[in-house]
């Protein structure tokens, strides 16, 4: 049996990097969505290794890459290089390094899946296994919540937050797995006994996506669905699979949405999760049976090409009718569209949850801090450096200085704002160029590929990208590698020139022998630099996390790890910030002051290091220097109430203590998100 499996892999060698990559994607998805450097950096090293192996194995194919696909790789590489260049002028260089490295990981993913020569069947296997793997991860997440003695730890303000820790990212993660599953469930090329499993997985994933009650996903997914129906082959089959998956979800939705109601009303969350799980199980069982029966029937039903073309036209017509009907119903529900849009705009500009949500978050107003995030990101940060930007992912510094809310986002909750504010017009143009070139490459596959299964893979890639780009326009999904990497990968598969029974001949880009040798040498050098760039911050972050969690048992060992972490990543102030915090809790003000001083030297705009230094100086009798540090902190973060309190109390005989500062910051986190899997300390 093992020999047979190895022989099967030898016949489809592209499955080897594909299976390793999707295993990485699923692991990232289950590891808080892969938004921290300790998660995405090792994934990037895996991708780098896969790219090196793929480039060697498919070296003859490198000269035959489709021109649009090659342009996409070059433009994305240029965007990554620009992001690294932005470190030079970024105020927080460690954050800019992380932002550039994250973009590097996405480049590696796109390159891996572009270089490999995919056959439609192999591509379908990879996409299908990803969806099934994600559904299996979802089963564990749901079972953990339903069986937990404290199920509320899986929620943030009544919304499902696992496995990413952020509700909106949970919705985007599972919807990302929905597209391949629902499409493959409609394909005749897929064995009939697997189509039911895929349809059940599709239904389960979209049901999981309801638990976070993400308003952005509810707004965006209709556009992605319409786009999917426009670009997918065999629209009748696709429409049937969609109708079944979404219909079963609609039947289970009231029980699923009740989790939020019970949680916000203070009810038994565990029972609510159990009821939701039962409803989802019944719905998915129905989908399993229906999908299997349809697959069996479809495998024995032969339709002429003219009938399929007619059915496709009917599918387009029905989609158009559904869109028009939806618009009519929507207009009837909202009344005057101008007044409705104005009301929603005023909601959006207002405070978060100013009017409450009632029994469902979908029915509440649109208030949030995003209007202020985007306003500062564009009118202050982008306007101050429109060409080059403030530096990759350097949004937080400028926002704290100019904000009108009490929120402290690290990212602007918008991919366009992130690009403009962080990388300026240059970086934004490079990234948009990549998207256009990648889309052209995928559309070529969609239009020219001889096999409907391959054209369907292109449709899945396009639909997933449309959903991701629309949703990430209003959220920080780019930061979650477990969400972004699959989207990039599917674009690479579909745009890289898949092979069929009659392979599409790509437009070659001839390269003379000296150029090839030079490119190989340059690629080897770049690979070494990339490995170092990813490995050192990753090891530094792991050592820092280890010190932060293990210092009560051995403080000296923790300090030693932090010293090493500081040396490995000379751009990051985090090791010193953690060292200072540990020293405060160990009642070692001298060590704390030294650590926070080093942190302030690495990040002069770090207000937390400044307030801690000011407080330590006041406690040590150095009033003049302490007050100066507090005023510098206020310049960096004028709206921070802790700084105002520290300055006011510095005038008397009872200055604010470092312990009080840390306690207040922890209380603030607990008041905003409550006790979750990541903030269990909030229960105490």
Predicted ranges, named:
Residues 166, 354-410, 416, 423-430:
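TM-adjacent membrane-interface loops and short helices in multi-pass inner/ER membrane proteins
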Residues 425-459:
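Hydrophobic transmembrane alpha-helices and their immediate junctions
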Residues 1-85, 91-98, 102, 108-133, ...:
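Transmembrane signal-anchor hairpin modules in multi-pass inner-membrane enzymes, especially those
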Residues 26-36, 418-423, 457-487:
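Membrane helix-loop boundary segments at the extracytoplasmic
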Residues 84-90, 102, 135-178, 182, ...:
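Membrane-interfacial helix-loop-helix modules of multi-pass inner-membrane proteins that assemble, modify
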């Amino acid at each position: 049996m093992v020999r047979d499996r190895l022989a099967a892999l030898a016949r489809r060698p592209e499955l080897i990097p594909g299976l390793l990559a999707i295993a990485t994607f699923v692991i990232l998805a289950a590891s808080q969505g892969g938004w921290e450097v300790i998660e995405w950096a090792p994934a990037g090293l895996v991708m780098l290794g896969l790219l090196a192996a793929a480039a060697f194995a498919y070296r003859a194919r490198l000269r035959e890459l489709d021109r649009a696909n090659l342009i996409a790789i070059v433009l994305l590489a240029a965007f990554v290089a620009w992001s690294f260049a932005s470190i030079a002028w970024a105020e927080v260089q460690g954050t800019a390094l992380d932002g550039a490295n994250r973009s590097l990981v996405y480049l590696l993913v796109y390159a891996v899946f572009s270089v490999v020569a995919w056959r439609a069947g192999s591509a379908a296997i990879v996409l299908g296994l990803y969806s099934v793997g994600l559904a299996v991860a979802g089963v564990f997440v749901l079972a953990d919540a339903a069986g937990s003695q404290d199920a509320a730890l899986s929620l943030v303000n009544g919304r499902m937050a696992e496995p990413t820790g952020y509700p909106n990212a949970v919705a985007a993660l599972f919807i990302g797995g929905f597209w391949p599953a629902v499409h493959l469930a409609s394909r005749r090329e897929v064995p009939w006994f697997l189509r039911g499993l895929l349809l059940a997985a599709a239904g389960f994933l979209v049901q999981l996506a309801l638990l976070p009650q993400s308003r952005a996903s509810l707004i965006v997914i209709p556009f992605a669905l319409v786009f999917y129906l426009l670009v997918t082959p065999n629209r009748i089959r696709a429409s049937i699979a969609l109708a079944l998956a979404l219909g079963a979800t609609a039947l289970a939705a009231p029980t699923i949405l009740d989790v939020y109601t019970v949680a916000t009303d203070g009810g038994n969350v565990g029972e609510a999760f159990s009821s939701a799980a039962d409803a989802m199980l019944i719905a998915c069982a129905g989908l399993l049976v229906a999908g299997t029966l349809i697959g069996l029937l479809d495998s024995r039903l032969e339709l002429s090409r003219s009938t399929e073309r007619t059915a496709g036209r009917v599918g387009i017509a029905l989609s158009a009718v559904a869109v028009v009907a939806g618009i009519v119903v929507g207009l009837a529900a909202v009344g005057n569209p101008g007044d409705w849009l104005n009301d929603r705009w005023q909601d959006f500009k207002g405070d978060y949850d100013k009017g409450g949500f009632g029994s469902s978050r979908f029915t509440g107003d649109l208030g949030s801090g995003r209007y202020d995030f985007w306003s500062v990101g564009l009118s202050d940060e982008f306007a101050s450096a429109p060409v080059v930007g403030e530096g990759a992912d350097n949004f937080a510094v400028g926002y704290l200085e100019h904000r009108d809310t009490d929120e402290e986002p690290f990212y602007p909750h918008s991919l366009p704002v992130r690009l403009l504010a962080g990388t300026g017009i240059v970086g934004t143009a490079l990234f948009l160029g990549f998207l256009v070139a990648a889309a052209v490459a995928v559309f070529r596959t969609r239009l020219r590929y001889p096999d409907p299964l391959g054209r369907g893979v292109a449709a899945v890639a396009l639909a997933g990208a449309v959903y991701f780009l629309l949703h990430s326009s209003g959220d920080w999904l780019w930061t979650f590698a477990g969400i972004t990497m699959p989207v990039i990968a599917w674009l690479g598969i579909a745009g890289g020139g898949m092979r069929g029974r009659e392979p599409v001949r790509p437009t070659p880009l001839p390269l003379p022998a000296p150029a090839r040798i030079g490119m190989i040498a340059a690629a080897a050098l770049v690979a070494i630099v990339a490995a170092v760039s990813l490995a050192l911050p990753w090891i530094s972050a792991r050592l820092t996390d280890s010190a932060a969690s293990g210092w009560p048992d051995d403080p000296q060992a923790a300090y030693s790890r932090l010293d090493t972490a500081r040396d490995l990543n000379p751009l990051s102030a985090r090791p010193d910030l953690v060292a200072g915090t540990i020293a405060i809790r160990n009642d070692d003000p001298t060590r704390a002051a030294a650590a926070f001083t080093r942190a302030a030297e690495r990040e002069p705009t770090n207000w937390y290091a400044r307030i801690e230094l000011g407080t330590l100086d006041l406690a040590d009798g150095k009033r003049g220097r302490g007050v100066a540090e507090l005023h510098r902190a206020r310049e960096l973060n004028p709206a921070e109430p802790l700084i105002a309190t520290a300055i006011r109390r510095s005038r008397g005989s009872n200055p604010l203590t470092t312990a009080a500062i840390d306690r207040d910051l922890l209380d603030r986190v607990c008041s905003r998100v409550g006790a979750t899997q990541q903030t269990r300390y909030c229960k105490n």
